[in-house]
Amino acid sequence: TEETSLESIGRKEKEHILLSDIPKHLESQMIFMDLNKLKVLIRVMNQYPIEPMETTIVNEEFVPKGWVFDFVEDNECTFVITEQVRQVLMKLKQDDVQQQMEFAFGVRCIMNTCVRLYGVFGQDLLADMVLEGQDYESMNRDENLETLLRVFEDEQIISRKGNNIVSCKIESEEQYTDIINSHIGKNNYMPTDHDIEAYCFGKWVDKTAEYDAVYSCLKREIKDSEQAEEMLEEIGERIVVDDWSIPQIMNCLYDWDVGFDNPQSVRRMTKSLSEWIYSVRRWSEYGYSRKEKQLPNDQ
């Protein structure tokens, strides 16, 4: 076995094997890394200025791994990337590595879309979506897919239960069972390119006409477009995951101190919410909206 063969060699040989494995391990981690985080690492390598949120990523992700060192002088922090990491980053330009990165990005987009649409889904369903229309004959597709699933687990995007992939938003066995039961007897919705574009970066809402109507009502009340988007992203998640209805959403808005000027504003908001909720793709419908399935709009 590999363990026995390692025991039979000397210390210097073991050190050589370990040192030769480090670049391969680094390369694998960077190939399968979230693209936004990789861009931050490249900006650090090139000594470009980074935003406060990017500084947080460096301090939380790269400094603890020893990829980046931080130096503080006169209350200013400077980041310096290690030479070994720099060499691996430069290697990412190679064609074979680029193909692996394209594969990783594609799988990440499909994974985020499936998590958004289904909550729980079979690993076979993910594999079928990844394979559709793609040609990865020159690479070990199954091995790379398994590596990516472990990366997504480490990033706390998913967990795995048997052959099922489970969103980390599912917090209990009861919730898991409820979603599984809600899928029984239903066909899953198959995402389009539009869906993948909408959900590939982990967003919960698709900015449809129904969404835009709710957004306009909310922005009119709070006079803050960015905050309105953040609120609706959070509310959208609750519709998808927990089947929130109008009373729960209105209570949430009141908890956030959203005040409506008059009864007409409230009626306009509830009407817009009714149409939006009806059109939202949700876990309990296996990725479909209630509007698509022509179910009654009980809002």
Where are the model-predicted features located?
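Basic helix-extension-helix modules of the SAP/HeH family
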Residues: T1-V80
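Accessory beta->alpha helical hairpin/"wing" motif in late/C-terminal subdomains of nucleic-acid enzymes
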Residues: I9-P23, F69-V97, S159-S182
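Short alpha-helical segments that sit at the start of domains
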Residues: K12-N36, L92-C109, K207-Y211, D224
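Charge-enriched amphipathic alpha-helical scaffolds
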Residues: K14-E15, V58-F69, G133-N164, D242-R281
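Short capping segments at the starts of secondary-structure elements
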Residues: N46-M53, R116-D124, D224-E226, R238-W244
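Short, amphipathic alpha-helical interaction segments positioned at domain boundaries
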Residues: T82-L117, S172-A198
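Long, charge-rich C-terminal accessory regions
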Residues: N140-P247
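Cys/His-clustered metal-coordination modules, chiefly Zn-binding fingers
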Residues: L295-Q299
